[in-house]
Each structure stands twice: as C-alpha cells, then as structure tokens.
Amino acid sequence: MSIFAIADAHLSFGTDKPMDSFPGWNDYVGRIEKNWNKLVTDDDTVVIAGDISWAMDFDRLVADFEFINNLKGKKIILKGNHDYWWNTAKKMNEFIDQHGFYTIKILSNNSYSVENISICGSRGWLFDINDEHDEKVLNREVGRLKMSLDSAECDEKIVFLHYPPITTDSKCDEILDLLTIRIIKKTKL
C-alpha cells in the first residue's frame, strides 16, 4: 500500500475550459491516466489536493468524477481555489453515492485512516496581512485544519494542503504554527 498525491488536475470533461491550450499541458489528461494507472494499484490511496475540476456545479462535474473514479486506487479529495462546484460534505457525499463514485472520498473537516496513518488536510490559504477578507478565509481554513487533525485516529498523520504554507517568498505562520503545535513533521519529497 502506497500513498500518492497530485493537485491541480483542472479536469474539464463537462465544461469548455481545456488546459491543454497552455504550454506543457498538451494531452495532460492522457498523461495523467497513463502514468496514474502505471504507478497506482487498487490497494493504494491517492490524495487529490485541490483544483480537481473546472466544473461550476454537480451536473458538469459528473464526467470529471467518472474519470477519477475509473482510475486505480482509492481517492481522497480536498478543495482547491478553483473548485467552484465544491459544496457541503453532505451534498457532495450524496452526489458521490448517487453516481456510484465509490473510490472517491471527501476530505473536509475530517480525516481518513489509511493503514496506520491519518490523512488530514484543508485548502489552506495564502495570507495577505493587509486584506481583511484574507484574514477571514485564513481563520476559517485554520479551523478546518484543526477539525481535521482533531478527528485523526492514528498517531502518525500526513497533512495535505492545496496552498503550501511555505513558498519561495512567503510563509503562512498561522498554518505552520498549528502544524508545529501538533508535531507534524516535514517530509522531503
């Protein structure tokens, strides 16, 4: 059993917003499918850390989730900044059940145990100290990450965020402080 991660797939089977119009994205869906199914087994778990689909609603999301559901492994998905279709966990789980997307689980204020590891996470946020809206969003995301960590049942935890808390030119102390308090170790990839 292995745990993999990917983000920013920006699938668009149900909407007209193909990413392969950008340099380096040519046939990206085919490359994702080929490499995913070459590396991932049905016993593995793949965390999809946001920006999953360009869909604006569940109706346009169906084809993207069909694609994801048909890939090997179990999938745990969390929200990215472009997941406009994202809704309450209850509504998303109803959507998943209605369409039989049983390999997909929603990571939202919760965690999942994979073997002896708890998978935790939230979207996170890049914080601009001068923007009141950013402060509200950041506080909400820190709260969501706390709920995810609080729900973890295993001693070992892996945290996934759509927005990395450290970039080349900034860091998000609020998220980093929470991870430090909870003794989440940095892993080299």
Label the predicted regions.
Residues 2-8:
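Short, hydrophobic/glycine-enriched beta-strand segments
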